[in-house]
Amino acid sequence: MNIPKIVKSSSADLDKVKSVLTLGFSSDALLRWVFPDASSYLKCFDIWMEEFSKIAFENNIVYSEENFFGSSLWHPPGVEFDNSVLGPTFEYIPADRVEVVIKFFEEFEKYHPEDAWYLPFIAVDPSQ
């Protein structure tokens, strides 16, 4: 078994990081329940990746397998993520699910300690 080499990714790698995370979450049960339509998922997940990756790249804490077969985005303790930037993606959520998604985010905030590292996304290309 080969042990993968993990490297820090730079902002120049943004598209590669977003691509592997998009593939890795393409069959994620929760995200696909939120965005069951493929085109909506791709459009909205791209917005989510753009926003969630900003904090990680600004703090130089994006890690990837050297060939970008997998990547992770980290947020350091004390960093605030502005959930309102995800607002435009809510129009793509089926109407009967919006309230549940909002409740999910509200509940998540209750149990997200401020002094902890946060791993918003980590995934591997399913073909690997």
Regions found by a protein language model. Give the residues of each.
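Helix-loop element at the rim of GNAT/NAT acetyltransferase active sites that forms part
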Residues: 19-39, 52, 96
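Short, polar/charged, Gly/Pro-enriched helix-capping and turn/loop motifs at alpha-helix termini
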Residues: 31, 63, 79-81
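Active-site rim helix/loop that mediates acceptor-substrate recognition in acyltransferases
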Residues: 38-61, 109
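A structural preference for long, well-packed, hydrophobic secondary-structure segments
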Residues: 16, 126-128
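Conserved acyl-donor/pantetheine-binding loop and adjacent beta-alpha core of acyl/acetyltransferases
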Residues: 71-126
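A short beta-loop-alpha structural element at the N-terminal edge
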Residues: 5-19, 23, 27
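Conserved beta-hairpin
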Residues: 54-73, 123-126
